[in-house]
Amino acid sequence: EYLTSGGIPIEDARNYHLAGCVDPAIPGKASFLAGNFFVVPKVLEVLLNDGVDPHTGLEAYSFKPPIEGIETFEEFYKAFESALSHFIGLWHEHSFLSGRPKDYYDAVEILETVLVHDGIKVGKPLSRRKPVPPNDFRAAMVPVGAINVADSLAAVRMLVFDEKKLSMKALKQALAANWEGHENIRRMCLQAPKYGNDIKYVDSIARELYRFLIDEEAKYCTFGRPEHGRIRGIGGASISSMFAGGAIIGATPDGRYAGTTLADGTASPAQGRDTHGPTAMLRSAAKIDQSSCASTLLNVKLHPTSLASREDLKKLGSLIKAYAAMGGKWIQFNVVEKKQLLEAQRFPERYRDLIVRVAGYSAYFVDLNKGVQDDVVRRTEVSI
């Protein structure tokens, strides 16, 4: 549906393959250039600090009046959307500049021309043809930590605006202190509704946030120039960006500590926040409009005893089919005990052959850096 909505003929769309990790492309009829990551919680962090990035101390966004003067959640969310739109625009300027070198490397274009359909006959790569063929594919923007933002917005909405248990000033002080001395406020934030549990209060925020991201991306073409490809979309291959992205983000209103890993993928709950079982998790993920995304990614960690029998395998198959029927695009599993992962961290020489799914790719667990290992360990372990 995503491909045909972009003008790709149905016969080509049905012949798609996966470029990179989870992004669809048409073999022999599409060029591919990896997209960039967009760390969504950074926008919320800057907004909560009245336009200043506390990581650098620099003013990154002009926002007035002070965030503490906002009286309704609707006003707060509108301010967040305005900031998000601003930073997405800056992100596209960066994307444009980072893509410019490709325009000057003839060897790249020659290779691309030779490998695509009708390339030798036409004598031009896809990006140089006018009009650019609808099959020309450029990787989408990958929003990192959007689920952390949904959880954070739900906490702000409930505690500051709906129930008025907390002032914005008190929340900002707790975040600035990385919760030290404000453990009671962190406890309140952790108890707020969390995505992944089939709770409308927070799932509706996640859905609305992704809808906004999708609509904003639809305003841009690859590198900001219509002649260089189709309109961009949202991608799901977070790879290990949740670790690097989290390293530059302070504490967030979802109860997360500064510098810790963000939620992986694009549809996965934040680590350990889904407590109502796999069915509730899938229902939350299915509320996101995945048909408008180039790709999405949902990671699930299963306890090995969940797949002990043939009947258990049938249950897993039914779970996957149900998710697809609800509109889910991509779901993947790690079948491993938390105990085994912790053991592998202590004695890596004993687990050289232990393979796990990280994002859209598999890797030897002991070869991953400690931060990414910890992310896999902390994912909720469920049974079916």
Regions found by a protein language model. Give the residues of each.
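Conserved catalytic cores of very large enzyme subunits
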Residues: 1-384
